[in-house]
A protein has these predicted regions:
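Proline/Glycine/Serine-rich low-complexity intrinsically disordered segments
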Residues: 1-129
Length: 129
């Protein structure tokens, strides 16, 4: 928080030491923006704690993961979150080829959850500040 003014855009981490979760798109994006190899950790919470302890200048991770960490850990007073989204990603379920029964059940359930507002309620509960 004390140096929040120095980090208003992603470009501010150019040349800085950035932490990220190992093997994630956050790691790739951190290295792309900073121009340096990211310090990696098994999970985003470990990366956030390294930031708090001064071991890096920034953390790049999935927005919902960061928001959840800040909410649940009660550590938000130590961090400044940029409003900028660095990437977007699509997610899906893998279903064994030819298993139309499971595929159709998943697709049907997802559509139902979106239509009845369940997805929006879950998102609001877990990810809206």
């Amino acid at each position: 928080q004390k140096d929040a003014a120095a980090y208003k855009t992603p470009a501010a981490i150019k040349g800085k030491q950035v932490c990220a979760q190992l093997g994630t798109t956050g790691q790739l994006k951190a290295e792309e923006i900073s121009g340096k190899k990211a310090r990696t950790f098994n999970n985003a919470a470990e990366a956030m704690m390294e930031l708090r302890n001064g071991g890096c200048d920034a953390v790049v991770a999935d927005k919902p993961v960061i928001e959840y960490f800040l909410k649940e850990s009660r550590q938000s007073r130590y961090f400044h979150e940029l409003p900028t989204q660095l990437t977007t990603e699509d997610w899906g379920f893998a279903v064994k080829k030819g298993n139309k029964k499971v595929l159709n059940a998943l697709n049907s359930a997802l559509v139902s959850l979106q239509k009845d507002g369940t997805v929006a309620k879950i998102h609001k509960k877990w990810f809206n500040n």
